[in-house]
């Protein structure tokens, strides 16, 4: 596998990591390992999904994280993916507490967002999330493999650069994840730390310190990320780092915007506008700074990061050697190009994300209202100031400076005068009394200059719970013009304020004045009745209902009704008032499918009882996830509520959710022991109900969630089925053993559960224990008499499984009990094999001490313990086995041997050890590769030098193991070694072979390097070793580079003297080689550099003909569209075949279409007289026949003549079938005659696409072919009647052949007898022009041009002054005439002849 495939198809040896008994894996590591076993346990992804599913879940706060974690675990086990293998390896051993912590952090984040009621913040958050959703997933996946990348590039020049990128990314990920889970106060404090995370991340875009920008620029500017060959591992790893770093850079930008937006919104909500302004400036500057770095500024993006990265990606994608890699690599490159292009477009398309405008604060304050102080917030001698801000729903805008303070003297509610805004924007007005929190007091329209600060006081008065004071103030303010509909924070009006405060006196007055607006929602969809219900103001609710307020109106986000809110709060009186409405829907569902009764579970037993007593209540209503109110009561550990629900005879205690989980399942998984006991005691509860699809009972869940107290209680219950088998035959005992629940296992044994229970794959509890990380369970089961020789369906014993899974302690315990270590499974595996492959030296020593000969045991793949130890890279085990006389030259079915394994890994010490102990240096695998070749291919120069200097083998020995690679001669090891070094791009090895050892002639190094696209090696050989770039053995380096599509190598060779038109093989040149493999970029370059497009190779083909015969559609199109002057589209080979013939032979319909649509002569016949259409018919190529039939009746493309007119008269289509070389010259006078008269007509739009010159020449051709001699004057009329008849008949037959091309043309439309008569008459009378008219008029059924236009055209074209005698035409002339007729037909095809042209 190449380096790029290793990076982009990243795989890890999960079993090796799972074997580490003493290492506790993190949640992320375990999730990753288990996903490799198809568990699909993606913790954070599942967490996000669950939060989306239960965002309105009516459960108490302390339960929410636990409940979400439980649901996440259910999703995990309910996926049906948990099999016995995962259970044994600890994948099922979910870190529940860690999941709970994750979920609680996620809910903290959600709570913060719900408290942030800012559209501007939402817009920035949406922008960030939209971009980050496409960036973050792959970026974090890339981050996981950086350890291996760093290890593989250790001691290289890019290592420090990649390390910086990796370190920055990990710091960013860790800190960002950590702060997201903080509660509000801690979150704000963390963000505002001096020189904390926000400061550090802002600095990361500067080219200093440990930032991110500098290392990315180094990779780009130094070209580290552009691979020179398929094996350029460093370049591919640098590319990986560049992509990861760039995605991190984008993530940092949007993370900063999110956090500063949050801070701005946070302080705006608190009314601390000065701090808000500070963070507003931060948002603006961050966006503009990062935008400049990412996409450039000032009209140039040449130095911008995203453009530079895109250029790198395009350069990598253009590498021809990518075609040898898996398609995933190309797909990845395309995805990254698309991703960064979209980000660039999105960022560049936004001028800014904050408003650039700040209104001037020209407020002039005067007190004109007769409202004496003290009144509301207006207190005598207090100072008041004002500030203004442009109103914007979607952009943050800056708040102006505060006005000079005005002292309150006797009056309240001043008038503010300000100039009309020049930007024609609405303006928000804020006021602040001394050091108190500022308040929004209103909005000024674009053309308003006076503003009375009175509406906020009305809103505040409405919110005053003191009935009399609030009412008195409202009355006074309304009398002075206050607007009761004025909106304030979140779009709430005085109606909302009164509903919340419960001031019935104020509310009554407002209701009377707002009858049409009682259902008006705020920005979150809360109406006045929502506000009243949420606060338990039953009187207000009643008042609103009396005045027809809607009782079923829903909020925007959660779609909750007033009844949901009242029920959640437990407001019984409010509930009663709502239920008095005849319109109430007691079972109305919110966004997640929860009814008010679900919400009532939080409100307590009294409100639940009220629901139960209400007719029509659906007591078993299910949410979208299938949860009933009874489920929620159990989840909340609230038995009084559950008991209240049980009073209803309709209650279904075994109701199941979408995973078939009953309330009992939830009680068990959440560890609610007392609730569980009460449920078990209910006669109607099904204690053995199972979930789907894994068929788990409550007992399974109790064990899985490690609720030992619950499990032990369940084991006491007689009706609990202790042996219930779930999917895969897994019983509770199997789960308890695999999860290491020793107390549970002991109790199960005590009550007599069968220890030999088997899964569907015949695993016993002891098998599972042997594979698990709990050796104490192994000991316990053995002590209880478990069968130590039991076999699985595959024939594995507990000991074999323990060794295969690397469980050394379990293996030693079993060996100590004298189990059969010779037992073999169906794969031929024995415990010694497992011990060897896992490096368990003590186990291997114990087994071999018992039976020394077992060291030679082979499994079904012919692997011995020694070979397995070598393949899994356990040097000490290898040395031990060699010391025990293991066959050092052992090979498995693939030919893998110990020496080869360590050569691949570059372990020189083990190479020396094995060779010194008799390893055969010539031993090769099934591909013929020995240890030396592997050292070469992997670039292990130390092993190569050791082998060469110590003369461990003969360099010149013929190697028959690779004879198929060298079929025509005996090739030595030296040949293959040098070839391999070049092919795999190991330049240090090449320098050693060619430079140090002077092996210039072995493997034609320069040709081989060019053949495999190894540019660095090509440069080295040309520049340092001065090899000839035109060496040919056979073919030059340029030929081979062109054939294989290595454009960079082709360019280098051409620039350094390679002859472009030099022969390769069979008379082909480099361009032929490139065309044959469809390398269009190489073809374009070679043409640009002078490749001869008219040269024919040994097969008689020009490059254009080669493109067609090679089915290289893109190249053929390139020649036709861009190089028409250098090719002949109608060229024929020695067999008379045209390009169209070849396209038909290869059944290439697309090529046929390209040629026909670009004017190829479809009537050309090959050496046996066949046209392309006839060949297609003979071969029954129906689609091509159908196409050619259709196209043959259409007018030849008009742009053909435009090409002919561009300086290439020799390419005129008429010249393809006429003998006269001077025909164009002979008629120049005709073409130039009467220019002014014809110019207007011929240049009219109707004739812009007509081949006029071709038609003019056609008439001449007809005449010349009729006479063979040229023009004869009218007086010479020596033709006999027989000759005229014969000529007329031949013309008519040719015309009939022309008509036969149109298979669907009704023959009755053309009377050939009449055509013959008219042609004969025209010939006999010498009226030559009428022949053309006769033939064209016969095609009138398909004509399109206006009659007048056709008549004018014909009169101009046929104005010739001669007649001609008729003779018998030879075949060649007849064929040419037929072609002429074909073109003539096309020139008439779109013509509608007027009656005046219907002759005789």
UniProtKB/Swiss-Prot annotation:
Keyword vocabulary terms for this entry: ANK repeat, Exocytosis, Membrane, Neurotoxin, Presynaptic neurotoxin, Repeat, Secreted, Signal, Target cell membrane, Target membrane, Toxin
Location in or out of the cell: Secreted; Target cell membrane
Residue ranges annotated as propeptide in the record: 1198-1400
Secretion signal, residue range per the UniProt entry: 1-20
Renumbered ranges of ANK repeats: 490-520, 524-553, 558-588, 592-621, 625-655, 659-689, 694-726, 728-757, 761-790, 794-823, 827-856, 861-890, 894-923, 927-957, 969-1001, 1002-1031, 1033-1062, 1066-1095, 1099-1129, 1135-1164, 1168-1197
Organ and tissue specificity: Expressed in venom gland, cephalothorax, and abdomen tissues from both males and females.
GO biological process, one term: exocytosis
Region feature (Furin-like endopeptidase recognition region): 17-20, 1194-1197
Segments for region (Helix H8 is the probable transmembrane region of the tetrameric pore inserted in the target cell membrane): 238-257
Matching InterPro entries: Ankyrin_rpt, Ankyrin_rpt-contain_sf
Cross-referenced Pfam families: Ank_2, Ank_4, Ank_5
Post-translational modification: Processed by furin-like proteases at both the N- and C-termini.
Keyword Iron among UniProt keywords: no
GO CC terms: extracellular region; host cell presynaptic membrane; membrane; other organism cell membrane
UniProt keyword Repeat present: yes
SMART domains: ANK
Alphabetized GO MF terms: toxin activity
Recorded domain comment: The H8 helix is predicted to insert into membranes and form pores by assembling into tetramers. The helix is contained within a helical bundle domain that undergoes significant conformational changes during pore formation to allow exposure of the H8 transmembrane helix and transition of the toxin from a soluble monomer to a transmembrane tetramer.
Function: Presynaptic neurotoxin that causes massive release of neurotransmitters from vertebrate (but not invertebrate) nerve terminals and endocrine cells via a complex mechanism involving activation of receptor(s) and toxin insertion into the plasma membrane with subsequent pore formation. Binds to neurexin-1-alpha (NRXN1) in a calcium dependent manner, adhesion G protein-coupled receptor L1 (ADGRL1, also termed latrophilin-1 and calcium-independent receptor of latrotoxin (CIRL)), and receptor-type tyrosine-protein phosphatase S (PTPRS), also termed PTP sigma.
PANTHER family: ANKYRIN REPEAT AND PROTEIN KINASE DOMAIN-CONTAINING PROTEIN, ANKYRIN REPEAT-CONTAINING PROTEIN-RELATED
Family recorded in the similarity comment: Belongs to the cationic peptide 01 (latrotoxin) family. 03 (alpha-latrotoxin) subfamily.
Subunit composition and interactions: Homotetramer in membranes.
Anything else known: Is the main neurotoxin responsible for the human envenomation syndrome known as latrodectism that results from bites by Latrodectus species.
Protein name stated in the entry: Alpha-latrotoxin-Sg1a
Species this protein is from: Steatoda grossa (False black widow)
């Amino acid at each position: 596998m190449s380096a790029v495939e290793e990076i982009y198809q990243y795989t890890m040896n999960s079993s090796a990591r799972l074997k580490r008994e003493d290492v506790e894996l993190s949640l992320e590591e375990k999730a990753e390992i288990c996903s490799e076993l198809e568990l699909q346990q993606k913790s954070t992804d599942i967490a996000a999904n669950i939060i989306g599913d239960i965002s309105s879940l009516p459960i108490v706060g302390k339960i929410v994280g636990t409940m979400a974690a439980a649901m996440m675990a259910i999703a995990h086990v309910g996926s049906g993916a948990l099999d016995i293998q995962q259970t044994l390896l600890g994948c099922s051993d979910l870190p529940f507490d860690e999941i709970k912590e994750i979920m609680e952090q996620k809910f903290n984040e959600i709570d913060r967002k719900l408290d942030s009621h800012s559209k501007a913040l939402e817009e920035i958050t949406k922008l960030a999330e939209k971009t980050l959703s496409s960036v973050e997933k792959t970026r974090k996946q890339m981050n996981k493999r950086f350890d291996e990348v760093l290890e593989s590039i250790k001691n290289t020049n890019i290592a420090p650069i990649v390390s910086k990128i990796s370190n920055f990314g990990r710091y960013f990920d860790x800190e960002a994840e950590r702060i997201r889970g903080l509660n509000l106060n801690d979150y704000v404090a963390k963000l505002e730390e001096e020189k904390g995370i926000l400061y550090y991340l802002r600095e990361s875009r500067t080219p200093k310190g440990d930032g991110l920008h500098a290392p990315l620029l180094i990779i780009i500017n130094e070209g580290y990320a552009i691979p020179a060959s398929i094996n350029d591992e460093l370049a591919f790893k640098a590319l990986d780092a560049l992509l990861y770093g760039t995605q991190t850079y984008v993530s940092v930008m949007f993370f900063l915007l999110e956090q500063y937006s949050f801070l701005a919104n946070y302080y705006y909500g608190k009314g601390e506008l000065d701090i808000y302004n500070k963070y507003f400036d931060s948002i603006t500057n961050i966006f503009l700074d990062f935008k400049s770095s990412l996409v450039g500024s000032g009209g140039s993006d040449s130095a911008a990061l995203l453009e530079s990265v895109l250029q790198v990606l395009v350069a990598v994608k253009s590498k021809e050697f990518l075609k040898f890699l898996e398609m995933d690599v190309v797909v990845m490159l395309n995805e990254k190009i698309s991703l960064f292009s979209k980000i660039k477009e999105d960022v560049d398309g936004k001028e800014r994300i904050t408003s650039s405008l700040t209104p001037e604060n020209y407020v002039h304050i005067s007190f004109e209202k007769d409202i004496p102080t003290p009144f509301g917030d207006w207190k005598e001698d207090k100072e008041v100031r004002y500030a203004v801000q442009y109103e914007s729903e979607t952009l943050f805008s800056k708040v102006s400076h505060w006005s000079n303070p005005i002292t309150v003297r006797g009056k309240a509610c001043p008038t503010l005068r300000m100039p009309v805004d020049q930007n024609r924007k609405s303006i928000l007005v804020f006021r602040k009394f001394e050091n108190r929190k500022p308040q929004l007091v209103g909005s000024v329209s674009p053309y308003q200059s006076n503003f009375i600060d009175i509406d906020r006081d009305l809103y505040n008065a409405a919110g005053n719970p003191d009935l009399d004071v609030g009412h008195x103030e409202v009355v006074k303010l309304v009398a002075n013009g206050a607007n009761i509909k004025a909106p304030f924070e979140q779009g709430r009006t005085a109606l909302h304020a009164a509903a919340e405060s419960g001031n019935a006196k104020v509310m009554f007055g407002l209701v009377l004045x707002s009858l049409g607006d009682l259902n008006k929602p705020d920005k979150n969809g809360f109406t006045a009745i929502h506000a009243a219900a949420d606060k338990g103001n039953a009187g207000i609710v009643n008042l609103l209902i009396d005045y027809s307020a809607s009782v079923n109106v829903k909020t925007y986000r959660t779609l909750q009704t007033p009844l949901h809110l009242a029920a959640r709060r437990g407001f019984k009186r409010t509930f009663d008032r709502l239920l008095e409405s005849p319109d109430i829907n007691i079972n109305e569902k919110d966004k997640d499918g929860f009814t008010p009764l679900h919400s009532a579970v939080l409100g307590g037993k009294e409100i639940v009882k009220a629901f139960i007593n209400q007719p029509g209540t659906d007591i078993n209503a299910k949410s979208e996830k299938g949860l009933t109110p009874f489920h929620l009561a159990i989840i909340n550990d609230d038995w009084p509520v559950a008991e209240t629900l049980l009073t209803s005879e309709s209650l279904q205690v075994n109701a199941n959710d979408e995973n078939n989980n009953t309330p009992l399942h939830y009680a068990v998984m959440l560890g609610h022991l007392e609730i569980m006991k009460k449920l078990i005691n209910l006669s109607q509860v099904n204690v053995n109900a199972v979930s789907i699809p894994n068929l788990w009972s409550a007992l399974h869940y109790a064990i899985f969630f490690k609720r030992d107290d619950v499990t032990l209680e369940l084991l006491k219950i007689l009706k609990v089925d202790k042996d219930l088998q779930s999917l895969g035959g897994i019983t509770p005992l199997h789960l308890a053993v695999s999860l290491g629940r020793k107390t549970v296992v002991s109790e199960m044994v005590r009550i007599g559960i069968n220890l030999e229970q088997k899964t569907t794959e015949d695993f016993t509890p002891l098998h599972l224990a042997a594979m698990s990380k709990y050796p104490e369970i192994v000991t316990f089961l053995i002590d209880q008499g478990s069968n130590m020789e039991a076999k699985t369906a595959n024939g594995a014993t507990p000991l074999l499984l323990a060794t295969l899974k690397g469980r050394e302690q379990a293996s030693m315990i079993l060996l100590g009990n004298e189990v059969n270590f010779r037992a073999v499974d169906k794969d031929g595996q024995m415990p010694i094999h497992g011990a060897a492959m896992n490096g368990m030296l003590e186990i291997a020593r114990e087994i071999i001490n018992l039976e020394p000969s077992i060291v030679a045991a082979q499994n079904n793949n012919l692997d011995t313990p020694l070979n397995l130890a070598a393949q899994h890279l356990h040097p000490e085990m290898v040395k031990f086995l060699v010391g025990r006389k293991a066959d050092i030259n052992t090979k498995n079915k693939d030919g893998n041997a110990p020496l080869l394994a360590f050569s691949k890994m570059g372990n020189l010490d083990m190479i020396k050890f094995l060779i010194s102990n008799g390893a055969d240096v010539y031993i090769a695998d099934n591909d013929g590769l020995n240890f030396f070749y592997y050292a070469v291919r992997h670039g292990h120069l130390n092993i190569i030098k050791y082998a060469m200097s110590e003369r461990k083998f003969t360099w010149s020995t013929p190697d028959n193991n690779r004879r198929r690679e060298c079929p025509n001669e005996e090739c030595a090891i030296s040949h293959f070694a040098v070839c391999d070094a070049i092919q795999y791009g190991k330049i240090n090895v090449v320098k050693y072979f060619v430079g140090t050892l002077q092996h210039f002639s072995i493997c034609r190094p320069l040709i081989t390097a060019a053949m495999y696209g190894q540019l660095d090696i090509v440069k080295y050989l040309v520049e340092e070793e001065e090899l000839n770039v035109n060496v040919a053995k056979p073919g030059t380096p340029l030929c081979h580079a062109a054939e294989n599509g290595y454009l960079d190598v082709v360019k280098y060779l051409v620039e350094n003297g390679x002859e472009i038109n030099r022969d390769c093989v069979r008379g082909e040149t480099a361009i032929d080689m490139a065309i044959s493999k469809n390398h269009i970029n190489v073809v374009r370059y070679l043409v640009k550099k002078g490749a001869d497009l008219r040269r024919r190779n040994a097969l008689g083909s020009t490059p254009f003909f080669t493109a067609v015969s090679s089915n290289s559609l893109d190249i053929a199109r390139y020649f036709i569209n861009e190089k028409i002057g250098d090719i002949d589209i109608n060229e024929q080979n020695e067999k008379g075949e045209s390009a169209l013939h070849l396209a038909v032979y290869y059944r290439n319909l697309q090529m046929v279409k390209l040629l026909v649509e670009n004017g190829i002569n479809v009537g050309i016949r090959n050496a046996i007289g066949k046209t392309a259409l006839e060949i297609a018919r003979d071969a029954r190529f129906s689609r091509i026949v159908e196409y050619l039939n259709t196209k043959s009746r259409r007018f030849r493309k008009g742009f053909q003549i435009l090409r002919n007119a561009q300086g290439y008269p020799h390419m005129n289509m008429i010249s393809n079938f006429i003998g006269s070389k001077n025909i164009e010259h002979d008629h120049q006078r005709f073409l130039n005659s009467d220019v002014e008269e014809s110019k207007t007509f011929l240049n009219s739009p109707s004739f812009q696409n007509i081949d006029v010159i071709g038609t003019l020449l056609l008439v001449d051709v007809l005449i010349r072919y009729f006479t063979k001699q040229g023009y004869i004057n009218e007086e010479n009329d020596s033709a006999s009647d027989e000759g005229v008849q014969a000529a007329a008949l031949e013309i008519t037959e040719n015309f009939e052949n022309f008509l036969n091309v149109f298979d669907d043309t009704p023959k009755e439309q053309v009377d050939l007898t009449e055509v013959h008569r008219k042609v004969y008459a025209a010939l006999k009378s010498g009226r030559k022009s009428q022949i053309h008219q006769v033939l064209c008029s016969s095609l009138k059924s398909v004509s399109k041009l206006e009659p007048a236009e056709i008549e004018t055209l014909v009169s101009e074209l046929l104005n010739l002054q001669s007649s001609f005698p008729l003779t018998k035409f030879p075949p060649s002339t007849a064929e040419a005439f037929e072609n002429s007729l074909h073109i003539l037909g096309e020139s008439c095809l779109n013509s509608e002849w007027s009656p005046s042209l219907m002759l005789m």
